[in-house]
A protein has these predicted regions:
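Alpha-helical transmembrane segments of multi-pass small-molecule/ion transporters
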Residues: 1-303
């Protein structure tokens, strides 16, 4: 894939993030506004984007491919924890759970879907949606155990049923059943979904303004983590696709992009819910988000 269109898309996304950054600095998009905008994106606009994109995208050659994507997603979230635990050994002993969590869970909703839509086209959103469904099951089961310690975290099955998971499953069912959404409903759903990318990028930019950016890159272990998160994992995913001979361009592209996304914002929310200090993960989220502006065009060259 040519890097030029990817760079153009990342410049667009960066300008949107910059808008959010300055909106925060000028008191327009403060912490409270970021919270309600995040809820709006997670609960309304992102599910709308998933539904509209999947139902209007070009169909795959056969439905068997959907099962293959599900299998790939399940394998991804079963194997990655073992790799992440091994990589986390390079970090501080008291932060290994956080490192493991940050390496496993990437930002699929806020950045994965918008970037995949921009880089691979809306056909790729079906792939990301399936990964999102497995992601939600994983983070609200293993993620809670990981951050909650040996006895502090309990599985929260209700948390697995959320707008992101429901819309992802609904989109797959609509796709498999060749069911079309009536135009009267599809047009407003599409309009809402189209706001996801600008809103999400602005919220991410605003969150970057909450801390001191200059202090983020002073910790060596965090820099190592950022390299692993944004370059090491996507290179590994690319290598696995080459070894296994993955022919489907969108599946390989989705795997590589998902592996190279910054830390998921859900991890910080989990820390808050489990009464665990989330500042360290928030730091990893900010660093990886900033660095991804440069690394995403680089890994896109592998697609």
């Amino acid at each position: 894939m040519s890097i030029v269109p990817v760079v153009k898309q990342m410049i667009t996304l960066s300008l949107l993030m910059l808008t959010g950054f300055f909106a925060n600095r000028f008191g327009i998009l403060g912490r409270d506004a970021q919270k309600w905008m995040s809820k709006l994106i997670i609960n309304i606009t992102c599910p709308a984007l998933i539904l509209s994109s999947v139902t209007t995208s070009q169909r795959l050659e056969n439905n068997q491919m959907v099962l293959i994507i599900f299998g790939a997603a399940i394998a991804y979230y079963l194997i990655l924890p073992f790799l992440a635990k091994g990589c986390a050994l390079a970090g501080p002993r008291n932060r290994r759970s956080e490192y493991t969590c940050m390496l496993i869970y990437s930002n699929l909703g806020f950045m994965g879907i918008p970037v995949a839509n921009a880089v691979l086209g809306k056909e790729a959103i079906l792939y990301i949606s399936i990964f999102m469904a497995i992601f939600n099951i994983s983070i609200f089961s293993y993620g809670i155990i990981l951050l909650g310690g040996t006895g502090g975290g309990k599985l929260q099955f209700k948390k697995m049923i959320n707008p992101g998971t429901v819309s992802a499953v609904a989109a797959v069912l609509l796709y498999l059943g060749s069911i079309s959404i009536p135009t009267l409903l599809l047009e407003p759903i599409t309009a809402m979904g189209n706001t996801t990318t600008p809103l999400a990028m602005m919220v991410i930019g605003a969150s970057l303004a909450n801390g001191k950016v200059r202090d983020l890159f002073t910790e060596k272990s965090m820099i190592l983590f950022t390299v692993l998160r944004l370059l090491g994992l996507p290179l590994l995913a690319w290598g696995v696709c080459q070894i296994l001979g993955v022919q489907d361009r969108l599946l390989a592209g989705a795997l590589i992009l998902i592996s190279g996304m910054p830390v998921a914002s859900n991890t910080v929310m989990l820390c808050t819910e489990l009464n665990r200090d989330g500042d360290y993960i928030a730091k990893g989220l900010l660093i990886s988000t900033l660095a991804s502006v440069v690394t995403i065009p680089l890994i896109s060259m592998l697609l």
